[in-house]
Amino acid sequence: MTFVPVIPEAYSHVLAEFESLDPLLTALRLDSSRLRCTSIAVSRKWLALGSTGGGLNLIQKDGWKQRLFLSHREGAISQIACCSHDDDYVAVATSQGLVVVWELNQERRGKPERIHVSSEHKGRKVTALCWDTAVLRVFVGDHVGKVSAIKLNTLKQAKAAAAFVMFPVQTVLTVDSCVVQLDYLDGRLLVSSLTRSFLCDTEREKFWKIGNKERHGEYGACFFPGRCAGGQQPVIYCARPGSRMWEVNFDGEVLSTHQFKKLLSMPPLPVITARSEPQYDHTVGSSQSLAFPKLLHLSEHCVLTWTEKGIYIFIPQNVQVLLWSEVKDIQDVAVYKNELFCLHFNGKISHLSLLSVERCVERLLRRGLWDLAARTCCLFQNSIITSRARKTLTADKLEHLKSQLDLTACSELISQLDDLILRFEPLESACSSRRSSISSHESFSILDSGIYRIISSRRGSQSDEDSCSLHSQTFSEDERLKEFASHQEEEQPEQGCGANRNEESASHSPVMSEVDKSEAFLPFSIALPFRSPSPLVSLQAVKDSVSSFVRKTTEKIGTLHGSPELKEPFESKDADRAHEEEVSAVTCPLEEDTEEKEIHQPPKEDRLQELTAATAEAMTKLLDPLVLFEPKVLRMVLLEWLSQLEKTFAMKDFPGISNTSSPTVKSNLGAHLLGETEKRVLDEESGEGRRVSLVTEEAGGQITCDPVSNLSEPSADRFRVCSPYAITNSLQRDLAELTTLCLELNVLTSAMESVGGHVDRASQQLSPEILACRFLKKYFFLLDLKRAKESIKLTYDSPCVWDTFVEGLKEMARSNPAYTELEEGDLPTGLQLLDGSVPSDSPLLIAFATRLYDRFGESALRACIKFYPSISPSDIAQLCRHHPAQFLAYLDSLVKSRPEDQWPSFLEFLLQPESLRLEWLLLAVSHDAPPSTSTVDDEGHPRPHSHLLSWGYSQLILLLIKLPADFTTKEKMTDICRSYGFWPGYLTLCLELERRREAFTNIVYLNDISLMEGDNGWIPETLEEWKLLLHLLQTKSTRPAPQESLNGSLSDGPAPINVENVALLLAKAMGPDRAWSLLQECGLALELSEKFTRTCDILRIAERRQRALIQGMLEKCDRFLWSQQA
């Protein structure tokens, strides 16, 4: 057998084909020249195949067993699109240009039904289909450039609607040439034609051309969703001639051009498949100038495209070619996560997976493809020996692989594997030599789990044969269970928000980090000390650990299976988490990734296992509605779990911290919470960033410096912002859920909480606020910070607890260099620094906002508007609670940052809870307001024209008043407006509460007739109200008139409210005759001037003319109708 060449180290990923779909096509009868596949699509559940006969085959990916067949008489299937957010819907386009949307009714176990057939593109060739990512809407593009949208309802809604109701079809836009590709994300539709790309805002109906330069030919474009880590915004990648891509922001502006022409001169990587042996040619070719017909977002960091020559996968953010492989005659490609389904021009389908090299080898080992696995190891040995790969593909597995090869036929492979295993030695052995401490015949290696594995050098020994037989049995069982279901083994892409990488993996493998659900070689993992005095002691430790492991596992299984109803939820939960990293540690912000293992003592490990069991038991109980919805029972469950949490993270188990707290510290805890300032200083000399000094400035001026290891328990006045243990992701989630629930329900201490081991009676006498502060400091690293923030504001409403929470956020933020840099520069520089270093949804934004507020005051608060909703008005209210006027200015600016028509709805959304309405109204009327002497006279009545005074927040006050509220709240708001003299709001509320008599009384005192004029004027509606108004005028005339108005003399102000002005309004409203009778009845007719008489005469003339005009029109209509009858 020839020597296998070695691929350069830079290639860390590979395309692999683990199964052939030819038997599936044969079973579907899609392998003939008459009937073959024409289109393909894939979703989480289905693989959809369209055929030349008009049939749509939907095959369930779970086992490739269940399938649906949907027939179409409208012609062959040309395009398929599966709904990404609901697997129950699929859209197809036929060769006649019809678009058919199916509802599969899988949840109701009904028959699939057509819910819509669109003929909008009939007679044209549909070239692209795309689903909306949020609602049931399909976008369709054809060869003449027309793009339409089909808005759908569910089948139930369609049946409930009237028969004449049609599904709306809307033409989105028409481009100048054939639509090549459609993509949709967050309200934006991306259209790529033969000449350029277009970006459409489907909600606002706005369109942008991307770039200025046109191109001619099929070039694709796709969205690249932003990642939660780093708060990256979505971008767009558009293919350009000459192996180039445009990077475009979400507003359609071209940011940069990426050139891949020279990078594609590297030789292609082989596709790992059992069909043929992988071959690699080191010869570097010429640069490739390609046109990318379509771009697809693959995995998390990659963009995929293809040509007639092969498949190309890029990491565009790094301008890097991850790989390219020769796969001929590709017609179309459908992707889901890291799976590729390639449709070839001959109708065949290839199922490929994008995997890291070590995961690919593991999959080959599980399938028993020993020769192919060995060749892959030898080809990619430079990638396999990296520290990241060696954690997954250990030397133990390579030894087993070597033992399965034929010594005669695979001698070259065995020799190369031996060399590869020798290169593993420096990381596998912690001793000076692999063979120095045991014997010349045997050696040992320390696995990642801590097990000492004895490796015999005698290949033909009985122990090796037993081991091989055990592994073979494991492989055969695993292969039997996973037959025709390889998609369940697919490694999922690394999650951008929670993955931990070392430096080497970051440079060589930036795409994904997958972990299989099970490990065939290690049935369980047992942690042992790093060094053991002898192999006998190690074996005894293995025996004890196995006994403890079996006992605890039995107890845990008994607990979890106690209720048969809980079996299914746990299975589904485990299935969702099957591809997550199971051993990634929770990292402290100040720690760096190193290859040294932390030494955990067995007692601590046992304690963590006990906490894991207690957490699983508590989470199981929370699934019971009788526990979850019964506060007393729920609190008992949390108290029981909290006792185990306190035991696990007890202070006495960590060095450098005393076991008892002094009485002075306990008695003055409240003062410490508010009076101490904590500063964290990195030890510059250590270089590793692992030791931290906490410098505490006490009230008396004494400064103490206590160097503490990052594993030590913080004392009563210190925060723990990172975990002292290595905690798995799944356990971290459960701990965060339970710890946050304890904070929300005020379960802050258990009955057994004590530093010295006895019940701490002093802690039971502390107030809930101080207990909450202590709880925050002890378990800050476990909390869900977003939920904790809301709980502190709603449950505790204490400045002490809020300040403690903010101090904890500051401790976490100090690891960010931007937090220190905020001390320098002006406010715009600080905001720009904040935008680039902190994610927009991070809870740490409050810590940064506090730092900016301390430096710049109110201007910093106004700048925080851009961080809404991450920083809410309630956060700002806590931040500047000593300066309410600053909060009021922030709130006013926040509301006015929205379009004016959205002010009421936005303010109503902010008023959560409802009690804020009265607080904010009281703030608004008491700040930047005129003095009460200018609005209210000595008797408590409104001063004339005082409603025209200027109020700083009048718009905000009126918005608060006009929002819907209950009757009691409206009455309280009325009293507030009256007491402060805000008469426009007071009159509005009086009329709304049907207190019209009170309103007209105050209108008379305000003495402004304009209040009763115009469309928005307050006019009496009944005869009794007019009599009341006239009576008020009579009463007013008996009192001495005011000497001057607000702006000087009465003549300078608005028209006053007097008998004549009111009489004119009465005549216009009721007619001159009825007005004159009412005035005579009230005894006011003698006070009227000639102006009133002339006005009444004019009104009578106008009334007669109007009656005559109406009479004439009626007569003409009557004559016309009679003439029509004749």
Curated annotation (Swiss-Prot):
Localisation per UniProt entry: Cytoplasm, Cytosol
Family membership noted in the UniProt record: Belongs to the HPS5 family.
Name of the molecule in the record: BLOC-2 complex member HPS5
InterPro entries xref list: Beta-prop_HPS5-like, HPS5, TPR_HPS5, WD40/YVTN_repeat-like_dom_sf, WD40_repeat_dom_sf
Organism of this sequence: Mus musculus
Annotated positions of the Phosphoserine modification: 532, 534, 693
Ranges annotated as biased composition (Basic and acidic residues): 477-490, 564-579
Signal peptide positions (record): none
Cellular component, GO annotation: BLOC-2 complex; cytosol; early endosome
Related illness: Defects in Hps5 are the cause of Hermansky-Pudlak-like syndrome, a syndrome characterized by hypopigmented eyes and coat, melanosomes greatly reduced in number and morphologically bizarre, kidney proximal tubules secreting lysosomal enzymes into urine at greatly reduced rates, platelet dense granules deficient in critical components, such as serotonin and adenine nucleotides, leading to functionally abnormal platelets and prolonged bleeding times, and mast cell granules undergoing unregulated 'kiss-and-run' fusion at the plasma membrane.
Assembly and binders: Component of the biogenesis of lysosome-related organelles complex-2 (or BLOC2) composed of HPS3, HPS5 and HPS6. Interacts with HPS6 and HPS3. May interact with all alpha-integrin chains that have an aromatic residue before the first lysine of the conserved KXGFFKR motif, including ITGA2, ITGA3, ITGA5 and ITGA6.
Keyword Cytoplasm: yes
Gene Ontology annotations of biological process type: blood coagulation; intracellular transport; melanosome assembly; pigmentation; platelet dense granule organization
SUPFAM superfamilies: WD40 repeat-like (SSF50978)
Organism ancestry: Eukaryota, Metazoa, Chordata, Craniata, Vertebrata
Gene that encodes it: Hps5
Entries under Pfam families matching the protein: Beta-prop_HPS5, TPR_HPS5
Subcellular location, principal: cytoplasm
Function: May regulate the synthesis and function of lysosomes and of highly specialized organelles, such as melanosomes and platelet dense granules. Regulates intracellular vesicular trafficking in fibroblasts. May be involved in the regulation of general functions of integrins.
Expressed in which tissues: Widely expressed, with lowest expression in skeletal muscle and spleen.
Renumbered residue ranges of the record's region Disordered: 461-514, 560-579
Keywords on record: Cytoplasm, Phosphoprotein
